[in-house]
Amino acid sequence: MSKLITCIWFAGNNGEEAAQYYIDTFNSAPDDHSAKIGDQTKAPKASEEVSGRPEGSVLTAECELDGISFMLLNGGPMEQFKLNGGTSFIIECETQEEIDYFWEKLSAVPEAEQCGWCTDKYGVTWQVVPRILDEIMRLS
């Protein structure tokens, strides 16, 4: 059986750091959230020129956040892979406490972001929303 995995390109070569940050954030969250670290791959000599990562350093770090698999790639600074708000990850929250927690952890500029959308210190965009938002939208 095939498996869908989201790969996020980190131009700043900080994918390993981001993976650990997300693991810590989700595992410390109130209510029912979970995260775990997965495998890492090391950079081969051939990737050194593109990524700027020395041979043997971490090229990819895998993690699972609330059951969803991610591969965080230390790909190097390539403009066509720059992160933007066109892709976001939705975190459905049961309580205001959860919303406030994720907003505080994942919003790099809280006063500049609104309507549940925030961008973290790594450039990844998140939507932190109440779990019942879809139902509310359908009923309006």
Predicted feature residues:
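A short, polar/charged loop-to-alpha-helix boundary motif
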Residues: A46, D134-S140
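Short loop/turn microsegments at loop-to-beta-strand junctions
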Residues: T6, V58, E113-C115
